[in-house]
């Protein structure tokens, strides 16, 4: 067997260490250049928010004024979000019917509380929300006990049982329609007192027997036969009794002209009424 000298072993160890690549104990973290980090808002669905001190500053950047404060649909969509009790979906509350849980005023009733719809939303008492549709609610009225506000059911101060809540199922929708009809009539008659020439974005309330849409954006003639773009509504879809009101109180050849900036409540009530009758 050949003999290996001690010098050979020594040179082998020295050369091995000399030519080996040193591995750092803590590896260097590379710079974060991935678009998942640098372009976060593009893939995450998050939007960048721009903050302006006032409206004039917005215009100084060349951003167009869309006049959303006078736009019916923008105002409906910008209303606070609420959860609909039947499908548990959140949507702007202007698209929903508000229900209130309150003490009953009828001394003959054995129920201490009552759940009923209201036309004008408010923060008083405990509230819940359901879709503003006559057809849908008439199908779901049998299970209306689940419409009781969750805040009342989960409150530590709860003092009632479900059997203590009165829900007049037979007149539930009829009473709502009566309140809505009465309030809308008053607001339309009041709005008709203003003699307005249609402008872009105005609401025209008509009774068009030949019309095939309850609400649409269309052309309307103004001063000097100028064509303006307006929101055209048709009360034919609410009922025949509205024809007389339009004929008696029209303030324009097309019908009753309403300006959102001057009669916001009337316009929202009108949309609420059309949605109630036409949403399926």
Curated annotation (Swiss-Prot):
Record InterPro entries: Rrg8
GO annotation, cellular component aspect: mitochondrion
Transport in keyword set: no
Alphabetical list of Pfam families matching this protein: RRG8
Keywords linked to the UniProt accession: Mitochondrion
Subcellular localization, as worded in the UniProt entry: Mitochondrion
Biological process per Gene Ontology, one example term: mitochondrial genome maintenance
Protein's UniProt keywords contain Mitochondrion: yes
Protein origin, superkingdom: Eukaryota
Main subcellular localisation: mitochondrion
Family of the protein in this entry: Belongs to the RRG8 family.
Function noted in UniProt: Required for respiratory activity and maintenance and expression of the mitochondrial genome.
Record-given protein name: Required for respiratory growth protein 8, mitochondrial
Native organism: Zygosaccharomyces rouxii (strain ATCC 2623 / CBS 732 / NBRC 1130 / NCYC 568 / NRRL Y-229)
């Amino acid at each position: 067997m050949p003999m290996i000298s001690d010098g050979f072993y020594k040179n082998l160890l020295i050369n091995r260490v000399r030519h080996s690549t040193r591995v750092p104990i803590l590896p260097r973290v590379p710079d974060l250049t991935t678009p998942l980090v640098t372009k976060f808002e593009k893939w995450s669905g998050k939007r960048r928010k721009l903050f302006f001190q006032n409206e004039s500053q917005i215009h100084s950047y060349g951003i167009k004024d869309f006049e959303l404060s006078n736009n019916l649909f923008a105002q409906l969509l910008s209303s606070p979000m609420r959860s609909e009790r039947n499908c548990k979906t959140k949507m702007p509350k202007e698209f929903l019917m508000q229900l209130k849980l309150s003490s009953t005023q009828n001394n003959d009733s054995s129920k201490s509380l009552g759940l009923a719809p209201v036309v004008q939303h408010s923060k008083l008492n405990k509230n819940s929300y359901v879709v503003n549709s006559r057809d849908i609610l008439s199908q779901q009225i049998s299970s209306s006990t689940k419409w009781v506000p969750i805040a009342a059911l989960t409150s530590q101060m709860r003092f009632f049982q479900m059997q203590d809540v009165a829900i007049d199922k037979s007149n539930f929708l009829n009473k709502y329609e009566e309140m809505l009809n009465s309030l809308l009539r008053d607001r339309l008659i009041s709005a008709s007192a203003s003699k307005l020439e249609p402008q872009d974005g105005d609401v025209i309330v008509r009774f068009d027997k030949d019309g095939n849409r309850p609400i649409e954006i269309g052309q309307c003639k103004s001063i000097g036969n100028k064509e303006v773009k307006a929101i055209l509504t048709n009360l034919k879809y609410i009922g025949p009794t509205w024809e007389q009101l339009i004929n008696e109180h029209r303030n324009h050849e097309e019908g009753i002209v309403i300006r959102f900036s001057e009669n916001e409540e009337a316009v929202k009530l009108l949309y609420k009424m059309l949605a109630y009758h036409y949403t399926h």
